[in-house]
Regions:
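N- or domain-start disorder-to-order transition segments that initiate the globular core
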Residues: 20-56
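Short internal beta-strands
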Residues: 89-94, 260-262
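Zymogen propeptides
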Residues: 41-42, 46-82
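A substrate-binding/cap region within the structured catalytic cores of diverse enzymes
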Residues: 101-225
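C-terminal regions of proteins
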Residues: 217-220, 238-309
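N-terminal secretory signal peptides and thylakoid transit peptides that target proteins
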Residues: 1-14
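Membrane-embedded segments
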Residues: 67-71, 87-89, 97-104
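Hydrophobic h-region of N-terminal signal peptides that target proteins for export
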Residues: 13-21
């Protein structure tokens, strides 16, 4: 999840000019605006990457939530899908399931993207204006806007009761049992500890359940809309093939075409693509590198250190 959600959960268009395919090592400064094919271990032109993603039946666009360049790329992918003649649903982690009816009603009544954010209760905790352009694009083309996220009350119940809080038989139906093993559990646990700035408190095991439930429910919602295709806006951790939404999609609909994109911020300490954990095989299909958003170190506040203003 990303910094805005770490307290409880995990994991410019001018920079998007197409780049020639290239196998040479790249320094951090040269990675921004470049796309990497994880399986082929090579750079691809961003135009090619955009087209491949837009053509997928289900495109999972894994973002850093507060990076506006990521939202611009996501909108460009949705626009490319429309240009291809596709009419996918826009599915959003930023909207909790409990507000779906309110969002549908607002859209039917001709609400603005800002009013959709209010109907979705997404104006607090999310930078909703950054998502508004892609919502506007969906609305102007009469695409469904689909809520993906578990309601907060349900996540609180999972913390207290575990996966049983999903209801009788739901863990089986959602493939939570069939997909899981001790190795995956340990890997996700490490990711959550890292996302909490190294804090390995007892709550971590409960957050593993929350993350698994979120991913499985997101997959369920995507499957419901998959007949028309889906462009999903979600945190990068949710888009991971080895731990996130694709795991549950593959278990329940193995023939479904899913493409996972990781939008990755440049790390000044990295010397090339291979230094990024996202570039390991089996995590994503494509990576798209961007400059990092300006933000305070979230670990300062997490550890009780005053954050400079």
């Amino acid at each position: 999840m990303q910094p805005k959600r770490r307290a409880f959960c995990l994991a410019s268009l001018a920079a998007l000019a197409a780049c020639a395919a290239d196998r040479a090592p790249a320094r951090p400064a040269s990675l921004a605006g470049r796309a990497w094919d994880v399986a082929a271990r090579r750079f691809v032109k961003t135009a090619e990457a955009r087209a491949r993603i837009a053509a997928a039946t289900v495109a999972l666009l894994g973002e850093t939530h507060d990076n506006r360049t990521h939202h611009e790329i996501q909108r460009s992918i949705l626009a490319e899908a429309l240009r291809m003649g596709r009419r996918p649903a826009l599915a959003m982690e930023q909207i909790d399931l409990e507000w779906q009816a309110d969002v549908d009603r607002a859209i039917a009544n001709g609400a603005s993207p800002a009013q959709i954010g209010v109907a979705a209760h997404a104006t607090r905790g999310w930078d909703w204006p950054a998502y508004s352009p892609m919502v506007a694009l969906a609305m102007s083309n009469r695409l469904p806007v689909v809520a993906l996220n578990l309601p907060r009350e349900r996540t609180r119940r999972i913390v207290g009761e575990g996966l049983d809080a999903l209801g009788p038989g739901e863990a089986t139906r959602l493939a939570l049992t069939a997909t899981w093993n001790p190795q995956r559990n340990a890997r996700l646990r490490r990711e959550i500890v890292q996302g909490h700035c190294g804090d390995d408190s007892p709550i971590v095991d409960k957050l593993v359940d929350v993350q698994r439930a979120k991913d499985a429910v997101m997959a369920d919602r995507i499957l419901e809309a998959s007949a028309r295709g889906v462009v999903a806006i979600l945190g990068r951790g949710h888009a991971r093939r080895d731990l996130g939404v694709p795991l549950y999609l593959a278990a329940r609909a193995p023939a479904l075409q899913v493409l996972s994109l990781g939008l990755v911020e440049i790390d000044p300490q990295a010397h090339g693509v291979e230094d990024y954990p996202e570039a390991r095989r089996g995590r994503f299909d494509l990576l798209w590198f961007t400059e990092a958003a300006r933000r305070e170190d979230p670990c300062l506040a997490f550890k009780g250190v005053p954050v400079p203003r």
